[in-house]
């Protein structure tokens, strides 16, 4: 596995916050080389075209291509197309799946409000000790997170409607 990113991932690569990666970075270990080094996206494009990608690669887009305000969906679609083109033109396309995933926990990508229980439901509302300024919040399923898969095995026009979360994608990769 390898994480491909530029230095400007604006805090979106959460591996930086795990102790084992902090220690690995200090010692320039194999873990740091794979998870938190900044080899740049040009290296990913080259490896994709030459069929030299590891079994799992993940990309953290730079801030200006993240679609976070003030940037636009057009900015994010540019890098998504560039990644897809590199992989689809590569020697390993016939055995590859690309998962595009968003990190939107604020619901900005969705037009449907997250379901939550009535305020009177006991045990379903808590005050987060770390975010007390937000007041009492519901617990349970959160906002829907958009993601899609591009692969020679997928068929267009289908929508996956089962409950899933970011860890669902990791579990899929581990199979």
Kindly label every feature range from the protein language model.
Residues 1-175:
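N-terminal pro-sequences and low-complexity stem/linker regions of secreted or lumenal proteins
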